[in-house]
Amino acid sequence: MAAGGSDPRSGDVEEDASQLIFPKEFETAETLLNSEVHMLLEHRKQQNESAEDEQELSEVFMKTLNYTARFSRFKNRETIASVRSLLLQKKLHKFELACLANLCPETAEESKALIPSLEGRFEDEELQQILDDIQTKRSFQY
């Protein structure tokens, strides 16, 4: 590896999420919130259970379902859509959007520690307002 984090033979830049540098494959990929993944997996599980020839769900599927159930921050489609809409209005990279919604940090300082790319891009007050808005949406979900 050459200094500066790039490999001169391939012309590729080394990925660094803290600088929002991702592999090319990620450029067109969309991010999902843990809550969205949970809803999709739950729907798939229900489809499977109602099918005539019910298939046994894989261990990986069940572990992922359990993980997303445990770490989902939002309980219904309306709240998920509302939070995503709120965050899409901000100048956030899709990675930052997903991280903020999945982690739900309480303070701007915590956000910047968990998501270093936010540092220098958002004032603490602006970031705190975003976090407070997310928390409000979480507290009013049913």
Curated annotation (Swiss-Prot):
GO terms for molecular function: nucleotide binding; translation initiation factor binding. Core component of RNA polymerase II (Pol II), a DNA-dependent RNA polymerase which synthesizes mRNA precursors and many functional non-coding RNAs using the four ribonucleoside triphosphates as substrates. Pol II is the central component of the basal RNA polymerase II transcription machinery. It is composed of mobile elements that move relative to each other. POLR2D/RPB4 is part of a subcomplex with POLR2G/RPB7 that binds to a pocket formed by POLR2A/RPB1, POLR2B/RPB2 and POLR2F/RPABC2 at the base of the clamp element. Belongs to the eukaryotic RPB4 RNA polymerase subunit family. Keywords: DNA-directed RNA polymerase, Nucleus, Transcription. The keyword Secreted does not apply. GO terms for cellular component: RNA polymerase II, core complex. The gene is POLR2D. It is found in: Nucleus. This is DNA-directed RNA polymerase II subunit RPB4. GO terms for biological process: transcription initiation at RNA polymerase II promoter. Component of the RNA polymerase II (Pol II) core complex consisting of 12 subunits: a ten-subunit catalytic core composed of POLR2A/RPB1, POLR2B/RPB2, POLR2C/RPB3, POLR2I/RPB9, POLR2J/RPB11, POLR2E/RPABC1, POLR2F/RPABC2, POLR2H/RPABC3, POLR2K/RPABC4 and POLR2L/RPABC5 and a mobile stalk composed of two subunits POLR2D/RPB4 and POLR2G/RPB7, protruding from the core and functioning primarily in transcription initiation. Part of Pol II(G) complex, in which Pol II core associates with an additional subunit POLR2M; unlike conventional Pol II, Pol II(G) functions as a transcriptional repressor.
